[in-house]
Amino acid sequence: AEGRNSGQLVRLLRERAFQLRSLDLVASDLRQATGISASPELAEQACSLAGRTPVLQLQTEAGPITYSFGRAPSAIWRGQVLMRCGPAHGLDGALNAGGTTPNRVVIDGLMATTAELLPSEGVLRLELVQQFSSGGREQRIRSQRLLDLTGLELL
């Protein structure tokens, strides 16, 4: 029983770390953005979304970045995914202008992803909810972050 509980805890901590890294990536993109769309579903997308729902649209000097939520692009991913389409990051973490626009899975196994723009409070509330089986039980993890919108133009 202890071994199973330890395995569940390790899995929970690993999935939580994946969520926090995903939120860090969005925060990094937001810090490099010049504008944010109030209606990402109406904005011109950085690439094909293949039926996924746009949840966040940023404008940067290197080009637009679209985050979308929905069906995974291939069977290797678990459940629904959060994808990022936009300029790639260089080794220094800065966005590279002029290159290809990769469309990559940020995190999989999602039940829900919410990006709520709260201009009156000057923040973006981003939430990721995952559900997965571990030790024969369903576990759910929810991570949320408030991201500062200071200096961003509302598009």
Features from the language model and the residues they span:
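Aliphatic-rich helix starts adjacent to a transmembrane/signal segment
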Residues: 1-31
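Surface-exposed beta-strand edges and their flanking turn/coil or helix-capping segments
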Residues: 28, 95-100, 139-141
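Type IV pilin-like appendage domain
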Residues: 42-121
